[in-house]
Regions:
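Active-site-adjacent "lid/gating" segments in soluble enzymes
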Residues: 1-88
Length: 88
């Protein structure tokens, strides 16, 4: 295999663990992270989803930043990397 290849994968819950085979989307991440409860005013209130899909966006930003960082690393060292990121 070419040692300078950058292989990147992104999933909802990571490549291993009990949730690894499940898909994910913004509402799931907000619910599981507690963001929907916090936005709704706390545990004694109804959860409220944050508009504009922040978990979808931040997951994509983290994935893109990981790739850019790997490109910088390859520019300096000539070596690629295997990246695994998750939405949550």
């Amino acid at each position: 295999m070419n040692p300078s290849i950058i292989y990147a994968s992104n999933s909802g819950f990571g490549p291993e663990g009990e949730w690894s085979r499940n898909g994910s989307m913004d509402a799931v991440c907000q619910a599981m992270s507690g963001a929907a409860v916090a936005q709704g005013g706390g545990p004694s209130h109804e959860p409220v989803l944050i508009e504009n899909c922040p978990a979808d966006q931040s997951g994509a930003w983290n994935f893109a930043f990981s790739i850019v960082s790997a490109l910088f690393h390859r520019e300096r060292t000539g070596r690629g990397q295997w990246l695994q990121t998750s939405q949550l």
